[in-house]
Amino acid sequence: MSTLHLVPDDLKQLYHVREWRNAAGVLTTACPNEWAEIIEVLRAFRLLRSEVQAAGGNKSPIARQIDGGFYAREWQEKKFETAIKIDDEVFESPTHKVDCYKGRVALELEWNNKDPFFDRDLNNFRLLFDLRAIDVGVIVTRATELQAIFKSLGKGSSYGYSTTHHQQLWPRIEGGGGGGCPILTFAITPALYVDDGPPTMAQIEGAQVQPDESKS
């Protein structure tokens, strides 16, 4: 039984939304405050032409727009220190940083990375869920059909098929990549695109001087 009916209709008109193991139901009942903030951030987001064309460096303006919405609501990037103890011997079990974490919700943004980042995210969710550190994982990525917009803006080569998008994500989830962790995914669709004109010089320069980041 799906619990996607708990996702507001306006979000389903803007994003492709899918769930694994009733993730929407888990968010609604176990993490209502975090769920409300996810809805707020995703409702406010728009995919701006100026940011698509200005995108550069190691973290794009698009990623910063979404991450910034969560950080403004006191979500934080987090690295969990995990280990397995057998008798008196401790085995380190390192995890990767989670982009946005609050309560018991882990959220990853994969706008335009190499697709193995999905494997990393799902393995992280699986481990953290099995260790009872999180109740649910959320991934925000892009819909594959945005490629037509990128091509029209001369950015098609920057968003190849082997980068992170919805069609690359779901075979991994259905193949068990996230284990038993409930996972909710949002894919940014053309319905969110706004042609606000080409980027200003300030936007271009701002994209070029961003500090080194692992996510784009």
Regions found by a protein language model. Name each.
Residues 128-134, 174-178:
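Arginine/glycine-rich "motif VI" loop of SF2 helicases in the C-terminal RecA-like domain
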Residues 143-216:
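Domain-level recognition of nuclease-like catalytic cores that cleave nucleotide substrates
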Residues 133-143:
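Conserved beta-strand signature within the Rossmann-like core of class I S-adenosyl-L-methionine
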Residues 108-117, 146:
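Short beta-strand-loop-alpha-helix junction that forms the active-site gateway
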Residues 101-108, 137:
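Glycine-rich, often proline-containing surface loops adjacent to acidic residues and nearby aromatics
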Residues 104, 111-113, 189:
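Short, flexible loop/turn elements at secondary-structure junctions
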